[in-house]
């Protein structure tokens, strides 16, 4: 595994199963990581275990990215591992459900990327976003998350074209995984 020492990587959603596993893998490969999560006790415990820095921030809060930028100025990469799952039939889906999920999964990802776009460009960095297989395959009661993550996939291909060749943008779309929200 390549040594990524001195190149800072941000992990949003660092207390979730995906984010914490990624943090551990990057740290074990020698990367300099910075964790971002809303739960202070959980993110602090992970940061202490891994010997890395962290910011307590909720991506649903206005100005969350400024809080992160107060702690980190330059980065090489970013993983937006924030996720949610709100399963219900279409007849029960509300506009508020859709707005919250879009804010969490799409709008805040855009704000995070915009906040570090210049640094990523300067450092020829990379961005990893997360979707779900439900965005491409039909699953009952997945209206909220599937449509929101499909928007994340659209963002990914758009930014990959817009940022090339300076910033690489990819999206991972796992199926069910063993996690707190699965």
Where are these regions (language model features)?
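Active-site helix of classical SDR
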Residues: 113, 148
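Residue(s) in the substrate-gating loop at a strand-loop-helix junction
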Residues: 132
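N-terminal Rossmann NAD(P)H-binding glycine-rich loop of SDR-like oxidoreductase domains
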Residues: 15, 23
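Active-site loop-to-helix junction immediately N-terminal to the catalytic Tyr of the SDR YXXXK motif
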Residues: 93, 138-146, 158
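Substrate-binding pocket helix/loop in short-chain dehydrogenase/reductase
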Residues: 89-90, 94-102
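Alpha-helical segment proximal to the catalytic Tyr-Lys
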Residues: 118, 160-165
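Conserved Rossmann-fold SDR core element
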Residues: 163-177
């Amino acid at each position: 595994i390549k040594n990524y020492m001195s190149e800072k990587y941000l992990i949003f959603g660092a207390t979730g199963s995906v984010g914490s596993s990624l943090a551990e893998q990057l740290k074990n490969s020698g990367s300099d990581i910075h964790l971002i999560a809303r739960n202070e006790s959980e993110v602090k415990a992970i940061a202490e275990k891994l010997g890395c820095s962290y910011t307590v921030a909720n991506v649903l809060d206005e100005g969350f990215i400024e809080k992160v930028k107060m702690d980190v100025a330059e980065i090489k990469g970013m993983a937006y591992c924030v996720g949610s799952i709100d399963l219900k039939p279409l007849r029960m889906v509300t506009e508020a459900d859709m707005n919250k999920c879009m804010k969490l999964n799409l709008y805040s990802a855009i704000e995070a990327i915009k906040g570090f776009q210049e640094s990523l460009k300067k450092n020829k960095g990379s961005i990893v976003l997360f979707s779900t297989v439900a965005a491409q395959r039909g699953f009952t009661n997945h209206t909220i998350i599937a449509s929101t993550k499909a928007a994340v996939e659209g963002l990914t291909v758009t930014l990959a074209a817009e940022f090339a060749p300076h910033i690489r943008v990819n999206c991972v779309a796992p199926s069910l995984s063993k996690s707190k929200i699965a």
